């Protein structure tokens, strides 16, 4: 079930909104009925505000809510992990002092979570869980007793409680036979075994501190059912994304390991926000060298340089203009210059909160403050170049004179992922969220830019892609995903198919890119047809 993750989140929100006063475990029939009801509500919410007339603002509202309900994750795992580490590791001293664990320890714990749950599940369709259980045992065995198979170690071992008795004692969340000789696996639909399957047993004090800082108890999520416009809505209940674990008695549970995986940035940021002074000074303000804004600008520059080695990039390039009779000295985030082109790059680190997405106005305001504002600033820089006889930017390396005979490309890079909205440029312009003159700016998220960097092999190829993107944005075409365009550009000659004044609907293609990245990240569980 491709929507199982969202439905599980919905169930967790309901479950944590009230005390756990039930005395009896639910039967299989009750669980299946609950799942079907939640699935029906899920479908209802998807179509609840679908536009019934051709109104661009209604369409955009629906798309924002659709993304909020359905879309999970903004980038490929290797890119997400890379950016997370680079953004938060400089703050590890703060986490150590505030929570007594490091960012590295938090990250490693999250990375191990999925295996700790999956390793308890097996079926006729897959032995993935069993292989992960073997890996878990091997890791524990070597850490506890040294190399497996060492004769001296084996001679001194106490096997009175069974071959795996010591492991079972140290890992009480793993089901086993009474003699300690065999592991017992759970079927995917073994609802009665949920207490064991989703139990996360801390291996040390660090893990206990992590779990304590990120756990909710039954009843803590009462706001989910409080009287409001979004009472019990699938778009309510963001607390489970900030605190993804459940504490019941002295046990901790993780009912879907994907929640911490999908919300790495949110969780780390919310932890930091518990110390408002540090958060504002060191993470929010761009005067701090380890702030989010400073990092993202630096990351965009390094990503661009990684696949455009012959382009010189200048951060924080200044230029002088006069607007409405007032002299100004605006700053361009990144100026790129090569023998072939000039790149005008603006970077925005805005993020949409869950509240922004649900209430819509916040999402649209932040879209304008990030995407539209970045496009506006790009246009201002290009206007300066075109309006000057000898346009020059001030940089740390000195003045950089721009050759006006070279083509100029405007690029706006955002941290937030807006790909599906940006594929509806006509609607964005009609709804006044974008201006007509912004169409020829390539707007891309940092994570999509990292994919482009992995696949584009030369500046000439990149310029061809930018030329294609300019046509798509200006010829009233529509698309769903930037990576669909990239894949069709690389594999299907899309650049030769797009034409000015000939709109296209461009769908599909990104699965080819998915497959390339999936080679490094084996996707664990696919039980085929869903069991009822």
Predicted regions located by residue number:
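Short, solvent-exposed loop/turn and secondary-structure capping segments
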Residues: 346, 356-357, 423-424
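Beta-sheet entry/capping signal
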Residues: 312, 333, 340-344, 407-411
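Catalytic cores of nucleic-acid endonucleases
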Residues: 349-411
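Active-site metal-binding core of divalent-cation-utilizing nuclease and nuclease-like domains
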Residues: 314-332, 336-339
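Extended, hydrophobic alpha-helical segments in both membrane/secreted and soluble proteins
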Residues: 300, 330-334, 345
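Acidic, metal-dependent phosphodiester-chemistry machinery of nucleic-acid enzymes
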Residues: 1-294, 298-306, 311, 324-327, ...
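Active-site beta-strand-loop-beta-strand hairpin of nuclease catalytic cores
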Residues: 336-344, 348-354
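Short, solvent-exposed loop/turn segments at secondary-structure junctions
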Residues: 320, 350, 417-418
């Amino acid at each position: 079930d491709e929507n199982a993750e969202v439905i599980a989140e919905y169930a967790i929100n309901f479950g944590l909104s009230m005390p756990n006063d039930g005395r009896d475990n639910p039967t299989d029939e009750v669980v299946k009925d609950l799942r079907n009801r939640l699935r029906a509500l899920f479908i209802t919410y998807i179509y609840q505000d679908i536009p019934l007339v051709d109104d661009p603002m209604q369409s955009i509202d629906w798309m924002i809510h659709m993304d909020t309900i359905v879309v999970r994750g903004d980038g490929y795992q290797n890119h997400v992990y890379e950016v997370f580490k680079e953004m938060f590791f400089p703050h590890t001293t703060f986490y150590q002092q505030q929570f007594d664990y490091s960012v590295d320890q938090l990250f490693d714990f999250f990375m191990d979570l999925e295996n700790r749950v999956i390793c308890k599940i097996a079926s006729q369709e897959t032995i993935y869980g069993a292989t992960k259980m073997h890996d878990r045992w091997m890791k524990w065995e070597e850490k506890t007793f040294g190399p497996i198979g060492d004769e001296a170690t084996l001679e001194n071992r106490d096997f009175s409680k069974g071959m795996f008795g010591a492991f079972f004692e140290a890992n009480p969340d793993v089901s086993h036979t009474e003699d300690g000789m065999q592991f017992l696996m759970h079927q995917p639909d073994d609802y009665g075994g949920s207490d064991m399957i989703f139990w996360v047993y801390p291996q040390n004090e660090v893990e206990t501190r992590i779990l304590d800082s990120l756990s909710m108890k039954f009843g803590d999520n009462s706001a989910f059912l409080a009287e409001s416009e979004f009472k019990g809505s699938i778009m309510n209940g963001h607390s489970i994304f900030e605190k993804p674990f459940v504490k019941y008695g002295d046990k901790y549970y993780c009912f879907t390991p994907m929640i911490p995986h999908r919300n790495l940035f949110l969780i780390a940021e919310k932890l930091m926000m518990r110390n408002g002074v540090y958060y504002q000074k060191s993470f929010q303000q761009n005067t701090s060298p380890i702030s989010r804004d400073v990092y993202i600008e630096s990351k965009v520059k390094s990503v661009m340089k990684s696949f455009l080695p012959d382009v010189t990039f200048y951060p924080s390039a200044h230029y002088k203009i006069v607007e409405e009779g007032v002299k100004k000295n605006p700053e361009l985030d990144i100026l790129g210059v090569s023998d072939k082109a000039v790149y005008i790059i603006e970077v925005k680190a805005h993020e949409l909160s869950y509240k922004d997405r649900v209430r819509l106005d916040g999402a649209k305001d932040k879209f304008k403050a990030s995407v539209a504002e970045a496009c506006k600033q790009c246009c201002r820089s290009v206007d300066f170049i075109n309006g000057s006889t000898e346009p020059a930017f001030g940089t740390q390396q000195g003045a950089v004179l721009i050759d006006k005979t070279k083509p100029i490309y405007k690029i706006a890079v955002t941290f937030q992922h807006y790909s599906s909205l940006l594929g509806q440029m006509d609607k964005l312009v009609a709804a006044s969220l974008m201006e007509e003159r912004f169409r020829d700016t390539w707007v891309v998220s940092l994570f999509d830019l990292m994919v482009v960097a992995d696949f584009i092999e030369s500046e000439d190829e990149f310029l061809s892609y930018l030329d294609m993107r300019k046509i798509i944005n200006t010829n009233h075409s529509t698309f769903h995903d930037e990576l669909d365009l990239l894949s069709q550009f690389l594999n299907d000659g899309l650049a030769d198919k797009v034409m000015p004044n000939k709109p296209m609907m461009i769908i599909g293609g990104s699965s080819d890119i998915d497959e390339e990245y999936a080679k490094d990240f084996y996707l664990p569980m696919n039980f085929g047809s869903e069991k009822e």
